Amino acid sequence: MPAIVLIGAQWGDEGKGKATDLLGGRVQWVVRYQGGNNAGHTVVLPTGENFALHLIPSGILTPGVTNVIGNGVVVDPGVLLTELKGLEDRGVDTSNLLISADAHLLMPYHVAIDKVVERWAGSKKIGTTGRGIGPCYQDKIARIGIRVADVLDEQVLAEKIEAALEFKNQVLVKIYNRKALEPAEVLENLLEQAEGFKHRIADARLLLNQALENDEAVLLEGSQGTLLDVDHGTYPFVTSSNPTAGGAAVGSGIGPTRITTVLGILKAYTTRVGSGPFPTELFDEHGAYLAKTGGEVGVTTGRARRCGWFDAVIARYATRVNGITDYFLTKLDVLSSLETVPVCVGYTVDGKRVDEMPMTQSDIARAEPVYEELPGWWEDISGAREFEDLPAKARDYVLRLEELAGAYVSCIGVGPGRDQTIVRRDVLAAR
């Protein structure tokens, strides 16, 4: 069976956890392929239990699914162990979690540098979560990072930590006037933490390819969203990895020809956390309504999300750069009780109409939305389970978004619960 990629098609927080949870019972493997604990997935079970996950794949809540933290992820050992304990304390079986030997470890000096650099940036800050994600990826690209497998060889680990701190301490002490970190202390803490996850280390790329050869279904789960991709997002206000579909193959070790379905997650409106351009952002009572009704607070950071109307320009862009075959539209229920629902169908930049994503950062920052007004609906749709159960105006809204985005809306979320989903097309059987 081929692999399926699940990605955010906006600026993250689209509801990927709900989509993964929906498909989790029908796949054998769920893989997180990039990012770190700078993003969160929320899963609400039929019992009403709410789980917020940051590093661990959403499939951990589905019995019989093997979950993998892939080589493209940066892993904070302390966060990993805390998250595991939190799940186990609530009765979740975590024995089905594996960690790629090639994933990079997020170290204390990454967090220290991330926080101090962002603080010094002042008004020019990017809006990082301060979790050390960027500095960890910097070390990975510079080939001086520490990988998960390094904890299996204490001598190698000690040498790598000492070499890293020889430079990192110079930065912390001489540039930012911060206290130096002791190599022996960092090593001791990491070795102690490693006792809690060493048994999970695996050759993930081998296991995943063998699974596909055995006709098992593999779901590749991205964090953040397309517009936060370091290459294809609104740079420099982006993350340090590739949440887009191309990153799924690199971050898991699966060949790209194995992937036949790319499921994009779209919120029925748009949100963003942190700094950066946001053409449809609202500063009026409508923005406040979306934030309150949609519960728009970041799972990981606790920061309030910026809210705006649906942006079809970025949806079309996401469809193209990811090769999206299907969409999961979430939070349609939040739009109930609005008289009209504006949809951004294009921009004006310096008075000129633009229907596609502007090429430059400065043009995106100056983009003004061009809206198409769609009629709203007043009915409560949280109980709808078939597309025909939706009011006609809600159906028209979905079909118009589908037309503008350029890919079929296969699933629709009408509430936070696992069962509050309309399935128009089975994405696992579609190809």
Curated annotation (Swiss-Prot):
GO molecular function ontology, one term from the record: adenylosuccinate synthase activity
Chief localization: cytoplasm
Key word Flavoprotein present: no
Keywords assigned: Cytoplasm, GTP-binding, Isopeptide bond, Ligase, Magnesium, Metal-binding, Nucleotide-binding, Purine biosynthesis, Ubl conjugation
Residues noted as binding GTP in the record, renumbered to the chain: 12-18, 40-42, 305, 331-333, 413-415
Enzyme Commission identifier(s): 6.3.4.4
Domain of life: Bacteria
Cross-link Isoglutamyl lysine isopeptide (Lys-Gln) (interchain with Q-Cter in protein Pup), where in sequence: 292
List of residues binding Mg(2+): 13, 40
Signal peptide: none
Biological processes per GO annotation: 'de novo' AMP biosynthetic process; IMP metabolic process
Required cofactor(s): Mg(2+)
Uppermost EC category: ligase
NCBIfam families: PRK01117.1, purA
Assembly notes: Homodimer.
Name of this chain's protein: Adenylosuccinate synthetase
Source organism per UniProt: Mycolicibacterium smegmatis (strain ATCC 700084 / mc(2)155)
